[in-house]
């Protein structure tokens, strides 16, 4: 008997009809004599509607306002969890919903992008012993002040991964509207090849670099706890999947796993003579702000950072306060940027790869503003209007579909 965590995304539960159609998927796992715990997202579009409503009544720039914002946003997952429990009960399957405070899932105090500190598994284990399927409302936790705190966009993926880790699950399945992870965005490369198997570190880099199929926090958790994860389609579960797992790599051989892009970025330039590079980076990273790329443009004077566009408002408030306190002299924001990332083990050791890439892009009049290289990733900073052309160029140039890995 295995323990399987099943997470159903927003498109999988958009309507009552779709909620009913995931029941055979749950039944199929039960028929294998496996135990199942389910995590659900809000119905597709609901969270966006709730965000819009909150923005209409509040500036959302104070902690007390963000606390209420979290209460509003978490309601979408609560509705889905109860509806799925009702649907399963109609099929004579014992099921019950759980909200974050009932387990509890404990978080820190960073409203709207909280980090989970612990997951109590006692109630979940009791349910499994009684053959009751727990259905957990994703995306939410509760802090030490007994306030709901949401985990940020993609938070239901994070919830599923955390439950899998806490319960020592055998596998975590993420059901979405695509059949797995692709070597490039199918909207740009319609014939992009599906990756049948990918290791944890590559998946994490793809997620960090803009791949929408899995949130980076979830990828990081399953890598840390070595939990196999599958990405598969709710609407075609028989069409195969992508397995995210641990496997040996030949580090000296360049194997390109995929290309991903991210337009939802903010390029920040900061000038300061009183704060050094590390001090500025530490300030930017506070409150769980993710830094994609950082660079010291001019020693002890000018620094640049690439962060998530969603952090723009909070960072503007933060940097304005620093400027008013004379800790920095100036800052600028640029939102017309994007990154294109090439992921693959050992690519740093291929000395000709970067030369070939930059030569090809220059020939096609694509201006690469910045390059950052790690062991398994090359990041290119470009204008956001050149993303599609860049991805097309690189997919053709690197012949990803012919590597045998994807």
Curated annotation (Swiss-Prot):
It catalyses: L-aspartate + ATP = 4-phospho-L-aspartate + ADP. Residues 342-406 form the ACT domain. Coiled coil: none annotated. Its EC number is 2.7.2.4. GO terms for cellular component: cytosol. GO terms for molecular function: aspartate kinase activity; ATP binding. GO terms for biological process: diaminopimelate biosynthetic process; homoserine biosynthetic process; lysine biosynthetic process via diaminopimelate; threonine biosynthetic process. InterPro entries: AceGlu_kinase-like_sf (IPR036393), ACT-like_dom_sf (IPR045865), ACT_Aspartokinase (IPR054352), ACT_dom (IPR002912), AKii-LysC-BS (IPR041740), Asp/Glu/Uridylate_kinase (IPR001048), Asp_kin_monofn (IPR005260), Asp_kinase (IPR001341). Keywords: Amino-acid biosynthesis, ATP-binding, Diaminopimelate biosynthesis, Kinase, Lysine biosynthesis, Nucleotide-binding, Transferase. It comes from the Bacteria. Pathway: Amino-acid biosynthesis; L-lysine biosynthesis via DAP pathway; (S)-tetrahydrodipicolinate from L-aspartate: step 1/4; Amino-acid biosynthesis; L-methionine biosynthesis via de novo pathway; L-homoserine from L-aspartate: step 1/3; Amino-acid biosynthesis; L-threonine biosynthesis; L-threonine from L-aspartate: step 1/5. It is an enzyme of class 2 (transferase). Signal peptide: none annotated. Gene3D superfamilies: Acetylglutamate kinase-like (3.40.1160.10), VC0802-like (3.30.2130.10). PANTHER family: ASPARTATE KINASE, ASPARTOKINASE. Belongs to the aspartokinase family. This is Aspartokinase.
């Amino acid at each position: 008997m295995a323990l399987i965590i099943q997470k159903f995304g927003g498109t999988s539960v958009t309507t009552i009809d779709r909620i009913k159609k995931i029941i055979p998927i749950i039944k199929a796992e039960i028929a294998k004599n496996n135990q199942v715990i389910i995590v659900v997202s809000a119905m597709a579009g609901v969270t966006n509607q709730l965000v819009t409503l909150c923005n209409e009544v509040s500036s959302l720039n104070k902690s007390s306002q963000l606390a209420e914002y979290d209460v509003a946003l978490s309601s979408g997952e609560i509705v889905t969890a109860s509806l799925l429990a009702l649907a399963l009960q109609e099929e004579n399957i014992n099921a019950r919903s759980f909200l974050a405070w009932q387990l509890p899932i404990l978080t820190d105090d960073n409203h709207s992008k909280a980090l989970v500190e612990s997951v109590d598994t006692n109630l979940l284990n009791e349910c499994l012993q009684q053959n009751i399927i727990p259905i957990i409302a994703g995306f939410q936790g509760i802090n030490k002040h007994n306030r709901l705190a949401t985990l940020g966009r993609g938070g239901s993926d994070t919830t599923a991964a955390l439950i899998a880790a806490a319960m020592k699950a055998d596998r975590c399945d993420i059901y979405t509207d695509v059949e797995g992870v692709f070597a490039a965005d199918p909207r740009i490369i319609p014939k992009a090849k599906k990756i049948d198997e990918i290791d944890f570190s590559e998946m994490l880099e793809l997620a960090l670099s803009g791949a929408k199929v899995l949130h980076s926090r979830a990828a990081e958790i399953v890598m840390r706890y070595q939990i196999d994860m599958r990405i598969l389609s709710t609407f075609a579960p028989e069409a195969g999947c992508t397995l995210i797992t641990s496997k040996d790599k030949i580090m000296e051989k360049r194997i390109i796993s995929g290309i991903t892009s991210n337009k939802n970025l903010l390029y920040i330039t900061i000038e300061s003579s009183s704060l050094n590079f590390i001090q500025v980076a530490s300030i930017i990273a506070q409150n769980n702000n993710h830094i994609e790329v950082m660079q010291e443009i001019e020693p002890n004077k000018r620094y640049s950072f690439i962060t998530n566009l969603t952090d723009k408002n909070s960072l503007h408030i933060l940097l304005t306060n620093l400027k008013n306190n004379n800790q920095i002299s100036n800052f600028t924001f640029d939102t017309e940027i994007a990154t294109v990332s090439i992921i693959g083990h050992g690519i740093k050791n291929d000395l000709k790869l970067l030369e070939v890439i930059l030569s090809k892009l220059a020939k096609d009049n694509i201006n690469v503003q910045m390059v950052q290289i790690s062991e398994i990733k090359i990041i290119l900073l470009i204008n956001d209007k050149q993303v599609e052309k860049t991805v097309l160029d690189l997919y053709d140039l690197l012949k990803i579909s012919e590597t045998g890995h994807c």
